[in-house]
Amino acid sequence: AADTNKDQTYFLCQVSPAALHKTLFPLGKLTKPEVREIAAKLNLESVATKKDSTGICFIGERNFRQFLSNYLPSQDGNIVDVDTGKVVGRHVGVLYYTIGQRKGLNIDHEKGPWFVIGKDVQKNVLFVCHHTHKEWLYSDSCLVKGINWIVKDKNEIPEKCTCKFRYRQPDQDIYLKVLDDTTALVSYPQKIASVTIGQEAVFYDGFKCIGGGVIEEVYVDGKILSTYQERING
């Protein structure tokens, strides 16, 4: 997109090449101010004066946690400090929290901020770390599955490229090791915080999106990052 801040390739990475071949993006070369200017000239006031949308488009301005509660049952449980194994608070349902989240945790903040580093959905436990131990957030590689490659020839997939692990996050330098048609091991020379299982990892060759898939597992120093108990025990 002409406006990189509004680029939607992160969300479109799973559109098949066949579908993309038949798809037009008439606004791709225009910025939002330019679109509004055109709309004003055509007397399309509702478009020209419409405010920027915020939040998730399909739920509008509603509270996201409240929206989820209408469809997904939740149960409160313990928040555990991964460094000590001690319970430091109570959560309202692990599905309402995301990796790297700092705000909205029911923990004594007099000891400084805490960060969500993981979840045990089966045991209904939310793992956190104190801000002085943020190394728990960092990984050096991840396994990505269900990749949709947007290239004519898979031999064109570069070994070295960039990846976006979250929307509007700066692109990160990575190395791709393609394991099969839809799976790749992604490693990064500099450790990255909050790479999250279930999120999309979207690959770029320069400004061109070449594909993306779902993060299946995250690693650090050859160990699965989510095996917190194993890391506590050394």
Regions found by a protein language model. Give the residues of each.
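Nucleotide-activated chemistry modules centered on ATP-dependent adenylation/adenylyltransferase
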Residues: 1-226
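Acidic, low-complexity intrinsically disordered tails
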Residues: 224-234
